[in-house]
Curated annotation (Swiss-Prot):
<keyword id="KW-0732">Signal</keyword>
<feature type="propeptide">
    <location>
        <begin position="20"/>
        <end position="48"/>
    </location>
</feature>
<dbReference type="GO" id="GO:0090729">
    <property type="term" value="F:toxin activity"/>
</dbReference>
<dbReference type="GO" id="GO:0005576">
    <property type="term" value="C:extracellular region"/>
</dbReference>
<protein>
    <recommendedName>
        <fullName>Conotoxin Cl1.1</fullName>
    </recommendedName>
</protein>
<feature type="signal peptide">
    <location>
        <begin position="1"/>
        <end position="19"/>
    </location>
</feature>
<keyword id="KW-1015">Disulfide bond</keyword>
<comment type="similarity">
    <text>Belongs to the conotoxin T superfamily.</text>
</comment>
<keyword id="KW-0528">Neurotoxin</keyword>
<keyword id="KW-0800">Toxin</keyword>
<keyword id="KW-0964">Secreted</keyword>
Length: 60
């Protein structure tokens, strides 16, 4: 029975470590749609506008 508290503590540590690892992954999933302007860059060249991370501007 002495091992039971140790097992409980280990489970808590593992679950908290999983939450720490999972947190940034959730943030990355949420931020992924923001990278769309980079993907649309080729489309924007056709309209005479260049879009980068800093924003869009006229292309010459």
């Amino acid at each position: 029975m002495r091992c039971l508290p140790v097992i409980v503590i280990l489970l808590l540590l593992i679950s908290s470590a999983a939450a720490v690892v999972e947190g940034p992954l959730r943030v990355n999933r949420r931020l992924r749609p923001r990278k769309a302007p980079v993907d649309m860059q080729a489309r924007d060249w056709n309209w005479g506008r260049c879009c980068f991370l800093s924003g869009c501007f006229e292309c010459w």
